[in-house]
C-alpha cells in the first residue's frame, strides 16, 4: 500500500515505532519494492523453472481404491453443490456463485470490486459498500476446485476434472500478476500454490484412468500450459512479499 492510500497514517506510524531496527529496514525496502513493481514486472514467460511432474514429488496421490464410502458420498454431495453454484466458505457460510465466478466479488455482501489497478495501489483493508476482502480471498484459494478435482479422481468424473482446470484458466485471465485484490497478500498466493499442486496432480491422475478413455495427452498439454501461467508469477510473488518481523502471518 502506498502512502496516498493509507487509511490511518497514525496507525502505521505507531506500528513503525514498535518495530525492531531490522524490521524497519525491511519495511522500507518493501515499500520501494512496491514502487518498483508498480512501474515494471518481470517477464514471467522467461522463467527457468522445471515444471513437469516428477516421480515422488509432492503431492503423492493415494489409490482411489482405498477411498472409504463415506468419503465418496461426501465428495459426491460437495461436487453436486459446487456444480449447482453453491460454495461453502469458512466451513459454514453458503454462497451462490456462478460457474465462472467474479473473482474479485464479495458474494456475501454482493459487492464486486473487480479492478485491474496495481495491487500496490489498493487498500484491501477497506473495501467500498461493506465488502470484505476475506470473502474474495477465500474463493480465490481454490479450495472448492480441489474438492472438484478430488471427486473427479475418486469417482472417475470427467466433467469435474475439466471444470476444475477451466476455472483455474478463468482465474488467470481475470487476475493478471500484481493487479487486483487477489495480489495484495503473499499468504493467499501461497495457499493458492498449495491448492494448485493438488488440482494439477489429481486432474492428471484422473486423465490417466483408462475407464475415461485416453485423455492423458490432452489434459497433460492443458496442464503444461496452465503451470506456465500460474507457477512463475505466484512463486515470485510469494517469495518477494513473504511475511517477516511483526507480521501476523
Task: Say what each PLM segment does.
Residues 1-56:
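Membrane-proximal basic amphipathic "stem/tether" segments
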Residues 2, 65, 69-72, 190-197:
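Hydrophobic, aliphatic-enriched repeat segments that assemble into extended interaction scaffolds
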Residues 2, 9-12, 75, 96, ...:
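Preference for short coil/turn "hinge" residues that link or interrupt alpha-helices
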Residues 4, 77-79, 248:
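Intrinsic-disorder/low-complexity regions
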Residues 6, 18, 22-25, 61, ...:
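Generic detection of long, well-ordered alpha-helical segments
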Residues 19, 23, 35, 39-42, ...:
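Short secondary-structure junctions and interdomain/linker hinges
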Residues 33-127, 134-138:
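Extended, charge-enriched "interface" segments that sit outside catalytic cores
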Residues 113-117, 126, 132-249:
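Aromatic-lined, polymer-binding surfaces characteristic
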Amino acid at each position: 500500500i502506498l502512502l496516498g492510500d493509507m487509511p490511518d497514517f497514525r496507525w502505521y506510524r505507531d506500528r513503525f515505532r514498535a518495530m525492531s531496527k531490522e524490521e524497519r529496514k525491511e519495511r522500507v525496502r518493501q515499500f520501494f519494492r512496491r514502487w518498483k513493481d508498480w512501474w515494471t514486472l518481470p517477464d514471467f514467460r522467461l522463467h527457468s523453472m522445471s515444471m513437469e511432474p516428477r516421480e515422488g514429488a509432492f503431492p503423492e496421490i493415494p489409490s482411489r481404491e482405498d477411498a472409504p464410502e463415506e468419503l465418496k458420498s461426501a465428495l459426491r454431495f460437495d461436487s453436486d453443490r459446487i456444480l449447482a453454484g453453491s460454495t461453502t466458505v469458512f466451513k459454514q457460510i453458503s454462497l451462490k456463485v456462478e460457474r465462472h465466478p467474479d473473482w474479485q466479488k464479495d458474494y456475501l455482501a454482493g459487492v464486486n470490486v473487480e479492478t485491474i489497478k496495481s495491487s500496490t495501489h489498493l487498500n484491501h483493508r477497506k473495501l467500498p459498500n461493506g465488502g470484505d476482502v476475506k470473502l474474495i480471498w477465500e474463493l480465490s484459494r481454490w479450495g472448492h476446485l480441489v474438492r472438484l478435482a478430488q471427486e473427479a479422481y475418486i469417482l472417475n468424473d470427467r466433467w469435474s476434472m475439466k471444470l476444475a482446470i477451466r476455472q483455474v484458466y478463468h482465474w488467470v485471465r481475470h487476475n493478471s500478476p500484481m493487479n487486483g485484490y487477489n495480489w495484495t497478500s503473499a499468504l493467499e498466493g501461497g495457499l493458492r500454490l498449495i491448492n494448485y499442486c493438488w488440482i494439477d496432480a489429481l486432474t492428471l491422475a484422473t486423465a490417466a484412468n483408462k475407464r475415461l478413455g485416453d485423455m492423458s495427452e490432452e489434459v497433460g498439454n492443458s496442464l503444461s500450459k496452465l503451470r506456465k501461467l500460474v507457477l512463475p508469477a505466484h512463486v515470485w510473488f510469494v517469495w518477494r512479499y513473504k511475511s517477516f518481523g511483526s507480521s501476523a502471518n
